[in-house]
Amino acid sequence: KFDDAFMTTYRNALQEILEGKGYEVTIVDGNNDQAKQNEQINTFITQGVDALIINPVMTSAADQIISTVKGADVPTVLINREPTADQMSAYDKLVYVGCDAAQSGTFQGELILDTENKGDINGDGKVSYIMIQGDPENIDAQLRTEYSVKALTDAGVEVEQLDLQRGDWDRNKGQEICQNDLAKYGDQIEVVFCNNDDMAIGALQAIQAAGRTVNKDIYLVGVDALDAAKNEV
């Protein structure tokens, strides 16, 4: 999302750095609409921009985006939604900048493994969790979702997924999902996995409202190291 905490932090830092180096920067919001973003890309190309930095609305749009910028011979940086190696090799003026999403997920699982009970708070021999996913179409969300749990199962820990819901990287949705799941599953929930910190902050609000305490009777993990999240650690 254009205005979520992570993208806002990224966008502001990017603009400050580029303008500090003397570049003229124009930023537009694709409004989570791939067709609109395609139009914006074409408009920038028509205007004769020197380079593009694009956070694709949809991972599946990578081929079309790459074809467009290659046809216009515009150097392009893709962020946040990683194309395949074959897609990246299609244009020699294309680069991708992003984190290792599988590693992020693995770190989440390892944090749970590092607790004294390895996430099995109620001692029933398994870790029961809910997963609040960002956007299932986003490769980072897919990998964080998969590898957070894989870290547990690879360590021989039995897991039980109570719920997996799409939170769209949004704090309010994270709170709503966690609130509803806490009402439905209660003390069965031992771990709340969130694909990003904004949703984790929302989940924390729901956990606190339910009278539970993180790292005591429930575990909660996110990704991004937002200041607001670090302040809660």
Give the label of every model feature segment.
Residues 1-233:
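A residue-level marker of the well-folded mature domains of exported/periplasmic proteins
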